[in-house]
């Protein structure tokens, strides 16, 4: 990939982050949703290898005795921009509908190739499966939102 194209991608990413900051000033995160941020799913120190967990602070009697269905949120952005924080209000809404939500960060083009992004997501799913079973989640009932 040429440097000119890479620079266009970096500019789009910077513009997106500025727009996200303005949007976040107008929105309020709900008090009844717990947000656990920046859990590393790989121990390599990259911010791109973290995930957030969203779960409702209010557990209904029905939910108390069953494992919660899971949504894995993978932010959009054409593989070149975006971040897991962009969808935090959406993830909170999903929690209110009875899901536990994992929002995954991954490396972006042009800093990596598409295959690397697939590997990031695969490693995040492995981490969730191996390490976060204490969240009362139902692994047989997983939906991925891209």
Model-derived regions: residue spans:
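N-terminal cap/lid segment of alpha/beta-hydrolase-fold proteins
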Residues: 8-66, 118
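Short beta-strand immediately N-terminal to the catalytic nucleophile in serine-hydrolase-like folds
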Residues: 144-146
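Catalytic nucleophile-loop/oxyanion-hole region of alpha/beta-hydrolase
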Residues: 82-90, 102-141
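Short beta-strand element of the alpha/beta-hydrolase
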Residues: 65-76
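A fold-wide structural signal in alpha/beta-hydrolase
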Residues: 70, 95-102, 107
């Amino acid at each position: 990939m040429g440097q000119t194209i890479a620079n266009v991608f970096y500019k789009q990413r910077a513009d997106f982050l500025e727009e996200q900051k303005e949007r976040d000033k107008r929105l309020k995160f709900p008090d009844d949703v717990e947000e656990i941020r920046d859990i590393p799913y790989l121990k390599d120190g990259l911010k791109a290898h973290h995930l957030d967990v969203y779960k409702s602070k209010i557990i209904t009697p029905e939910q108390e005795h069953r494992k919660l269905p899971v949504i894995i949120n993978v932010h959009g952005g054409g593989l070149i921009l975006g971040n897991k924080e962009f969808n935090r209000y959406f993830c909170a809404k999903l929690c209110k509908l009875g899901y536990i939500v994992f929002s995954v960060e991954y490396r972006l083009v042009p800093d990596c190739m598409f295959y690397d992004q697939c590997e990031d997501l695969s490693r995040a799913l492995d981490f969730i499966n191996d390490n976060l079973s204490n969240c009362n989640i139902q692994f047989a009932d997983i939906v991925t939102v891209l």
